Amino acid sequence: MLEAMREKPPLVHCITNYVAMNIAANVLLASGASPAMVHAPEEAGEFAGIASALTVNIGTLSTQWLDGMRAAAKAAASSGKPWVLDPVAHYATAFRRQAVADLLALKPTIIRGNASEIIALAGGESRGQGVDSRDPVEQAEDSARRLAERQQAIVAVTGAVDFVTDGNRAVRIKGGSVLMPQVTALGCALTCLVGAFAATAPEDLFGATVAALATFAVAGEDAALGAAGPGSFAWRFLDALAALDGEALDARARVSIA
């Protein structure tokens, strides 16, 4: 799937936050996809119809950005394009809770979040603080299954060991590095990469989500080998993504049935 993406780079419409734009765009470029950071409500809907996939991240939310998100999500849904929701800290304020409720009504095909975000999104009590998760991934697995069934979507919970489910099937993905949470917006960039893989294999969104997370995990392991800390890890991670090929990914991905 990684090689297929590079042979035919998908145009990925990324509505993400200010903090994430640079790293998200570079992650897509290093992986072989084509990013577009378009969020104005005057054009977001039209652009979503042009792109191969849409990703929506509510990290730095505003009324204007939310209008763009709704317009893009409506366009993606009506045209059958995959779209990914990243409900960053949706539990933190009433504005965020309502925004995510509105976006969930537009039926995202994939939802990616940390454990605290997924637990809360499924109706549970999470220990999240701001954008940071205080819950381990394993405690979010049942919540992810329920959310996937309720939304008829793929749900990915990312953390030390990632978890992906469609409500019936479920897998865990191991790998990555302890340095990854120390680089801001890597999770947001992962959401965009999930969109790129979904655009490449819209007929297999479960497999596309797993492939994106496995790509991040393997690249994270490679980047950590020579990194002295989060600063050198960040640029090494982009190099590792660019150097990774499909054969190495297939050989090294640590995916197990959950």
UniProtKB/Swiss-Prot annotation:
Cofactor(s) needed: Mg(2+)
UniProt xrefs under CDD domains: THZ_kinase
Binding site for substrate: 37, 185
Binding sites annotated in the UniProt record for ATP: 112, 158
Pathway the protein contributes to: Cofactor biosynthesis; thiamine diphosphate biosynthesis; 4-methyl-5-(2-phosphoethyl)-thiazole from 5-(2-hydroxyethyl)-4-methylthiazole: step 1/1
Reaction it catalyzes: 5-(2-hydroxyethyl)-4-methylthiazole + ATP = 4-methyl-5-(2-phosphooxyethyl)-thiazole + ADP + H(+)
Keywords annotated in UniProt: ATP-binding, Kinase, Magnesium, Metal-binding, Nucleotide-binding, Plasmid, Thiamine biosynthesis, Transferase
GO MF term list: ATP binding; hydroxyethylthiazole kinase activity; magnesium ion binding
Domain of life assignment: Bacteria
SUPFAM superfamilies: Ribokinase-like
Pfam families: HK (PF02110)
Single Gene Ontology BP annotation: thiamine biosynthetic process
EC number(s) recorded for this UniProt protein: 2.7.1.50
HAMAP family: Thz_kinase (MF_00228)
Function per UniProt: Catalyzes the phosphorylation of the hydroxyl group of 4-methyl-5-beta-hydroxyethylthiazole (THZ).
Name the record gives this protein: Hydroxyethylthiazole kinase
Source organism of this protein record: Rhizobium etli (strain CIAT 652)
